[in-house]
Amino acid sequence: TDLIHRMTGELVAEGSLLCSTLYWNIITKKYWDEMLDFLGITEDQLPSIRESGEPVGELKPEVAEELGLSPRTVVATGALDQVCGAIGVGNVEPGMFSENTGAALAICAVLEKPIFDKEGRMPIHYYGIPDTYMAHTFTTGGMVLRWYRDNFGREEMSVAELLDTDPYNILGDEASKVPPGSDGLVMLPHLQGAMAPEANPKAKGVFFGFTLKHTKAHFARAIMEAIGFI
């Protein structure tokens, strides 16, 4: 919304991001009057609502000049990052399923209509395709390995700098020498709470079963296995 406003002067938003505001109704695709009243704001103070991918306008002349682009360049609405990722891999029809592992591990399934879980285990988002929805759950993914690298992989980071390579390559090479199952070392990667199978913001990460025989490579592999199997 902010970038589009800076580029075009228009104040607009779209459903997949508005889902996170708590004042947009995913069923009616309108602002939620009850919540607006509670917050003490009016619809006039909020962005107009568009569908994802809908053209908003052309670049403002001063922005086009700064970016070196034609002032006729059309700016369109985007979508939530995981929505864009799912559409990018072809997840565009109800019944399809995709998974993305980056900083987070996200699972997305396209739905014709929102199906709400009374237990709150599966968030539902508006999708980047009109009148389509997404069941979307996520947990910590690559950020767990980054945490390990930053806190326990200083040696690997130094070696990687000398060899002009990525420290993750070195961590991966070391982990590959450990047998599947990490010799009994098990990890739960809930370093920022858990979303599934039950939403639990108080969930914590766990290393279980480690002994004197386990090495740094075992811990690196246990993290990779945890992310892969979750």
Show where each model-derived region lies:
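A glycine-/small-polar-enriched, mobile loop at the entrance of the PLP active site in fold-type I
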Residues: 18-24, 44-52, 134
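Active-site core segments that coordinate phosphate-bearing ligands/cofactors
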Residues: 1-13, 22-33, 37-38, 55, ...
